[in-house]
Amino acid sequence: MPELVPGIQQRIKALETFGLTITPNTLKIEEVTEENWATAWKKYYHPLQVTRFLTVVPSWEAYELKQADERVIRLDPGLAFGTGTHPTTILSLQALETYIRGNETILDVGTGSGVLSIASKALGAKHVHAYDLDDVAVKAAMDNIRLNDYAKDVTVKANDLLKGVTIEADIVVANILSEIIVPLIPEAYAVLKPGGLFLTSGIIEDKKELILSEQKKQGFTIIQVQQMKDWCSIVAKKPLAEDE
């Protein structure tokens, strides 16, 4: 590592060519064990009530219910995924809590840690199918599902969005980047039952109008737009046959 110091110092000095003023500084290098990186974040992660009924609890902490109708989601996000507390995740969880009535078939696209699939089962969905293009995410989701016995029948598969999926769904939920939501819109429309809902989050504020426009062009009716900090979620409905 010490042999890298001169090169780093030169690059810092070069920042002055971009008009930046570099004040006197000291470059310090020390070794940190991988185990410390792998576990240090855990001390910042504690049980958190994220919606009216849902509380996310780290897998390594004991937790007692605070209310009789509370649903607990046990989660071990590891280093690759969030803890369920990012605004985009909370917006997705709020939408699921609002629109799940019970016995639905739900498709979770870009499942990541699996938190939305687990929440769907906690809220009463009958069939939940989770998809992610990343094999690491598929494994993480499966591991987290095993932490929540009520969600043990959630299926998790590696898949590119909804390509090749023919399951008819009551709800499609996707907390993914806006650029990925756009090609998902026609795929979601195709698998949704008439009257089905498309719940999207992960939408930065300046991309909101783009997503709304694309959904409307596809034939969706917009029924709710929510915002938390710089992030938005959209709930869109596939019209019933008589509404088309």
Locate predicted features.
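Conserved beta-strand segments that form the floor/walls of ligand-binding pockets within enzyme
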Residues: 49, 55, 74-76, 177, ...
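Surface-exposed loop/turn positions
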Residues: 52-54, 104, 196
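Short loop/helix-cap segments at secondary-structure boundaries that form the rim of catalytic
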Residues: 63-69, 164-167
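Conserved SAM/SAH cofactor-binding pocket of Class I
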Residues: 79-161, 165-168
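S-adenosylmethionine
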Residues: 127, 133-243
